[in-house]
């Protein structure tokens, strides 16, 4: 995929990755190569690749079906990493990833694949810009910044603390 992008900047490659991000480790060398292309070419080239991986826990999958790998992969400059929380985020970020220049690691939270609480209306041709957070719950006492399926855990905690203590927690 990295080499194929070199022929034409209009080529965008989407790689449907492993069923579980846990199985991505043997391919991490290729990931590293893609993250280095921009720096290696002095800004002349960046691979237009979107790599999709199912990631995360909370599905009862055990040791090799619950890993969250973004922490290790964010230490390598040269890739954007996105991790949606709701259906509109998922659709919008995937469209933006596929249409943008550069390398994007698109992590899909497995726990939300069939989660009713993550379902939202998705407008046609909807995109979510990179680097723009969404306030999912307004509040004034404390701000929680989160992503992926833990957004839903934080929303539940915010609601509980509001009912029990009257605290207004913002969830971004």
For every predicted segment, state its role.
Residues 161-165:
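Alpha-helix capping/termination and helix-coil
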């Amino acid at each position: 995929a990295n080499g194929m992008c070199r022929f034409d900047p209009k080529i965008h490659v989407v790689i449907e990755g492993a069923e579980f991000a846990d199985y991505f480790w043997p391919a991490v060398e290729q990931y590293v190569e893609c993250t280095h292309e921009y720096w290696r070419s002095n800004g002349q080239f960046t691979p237009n690749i979107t790599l999709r991986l199912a990631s995360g826990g909370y599905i009862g999958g055990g040791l090799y079906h619950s890993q969250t790998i973004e922490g290790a992969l964010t230490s390598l400059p040269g890739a954007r990493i996105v991790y949606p929380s709701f259906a509109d985020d998922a659709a919008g970020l995937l469209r933006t990833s596929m249409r943008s220049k550069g390398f994007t690691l698109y992590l899909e939270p497995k726990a939300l694949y069939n989660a009713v609480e993550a379902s939202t209306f998705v407008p046609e041709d909807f995109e979510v810009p990179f680097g723009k957070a969404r306030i999912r719950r307004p509040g004034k006492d404390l701000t929680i910044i989160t992503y992926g399926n833990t957004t839903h855990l934080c929303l539940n905690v915010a609601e509980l603390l509001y009912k029990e203590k009257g605290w207004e927690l913002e969830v971004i």
